Amino acid sequence: MDNARTTSDPANTEQTNDPRIGAFYKLYHTLSPETAGTEKLRRCLEQVYHPDIAFSDPMHRITGMDALEKYFEGLYENITYIDFQFHNAWVESDTGSVHWTMRYRHPRLKAGTDGVTLLRWENNLVVQHQDIFDAGSLLYEHLPVIGWLIHKLKERMA
């Protein structure tokens, strides 16, 4: 497997000097297939996420650190490359958001999407993480038959 890494500068907190955002960026710079299933993965997650983390995206709802660790192990298991580029962040008190672009390579797919992560912290750890992105553009539109159907539906709706 190729190295799957984020290439954005993990210290790029130009929109905010909040160290919690810096830690979030650093985490996604560190995660890779090489960290999946290792103690390092757990340690990295524990530096950013609360033990009672509630994590969601358009395809998953996860509660707790153990489930989050399994999610990341599965996520990085089949990819050969991943890159998160962080564009800007906003923080006020214990809530924040991060705008990002993700690109990845899977043995059968090469895709990416833009998204936003909504964050809520408790004791400086992320207790709620919600990713918002177009799941179709990330996955379904790249599958042969389903992708063609989605493309045709979008054409008709335009």
Indicate residue ranges for each PLM-predicted region:
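C-terminal and inter-domain tail/linker signature
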Residues: 2-158
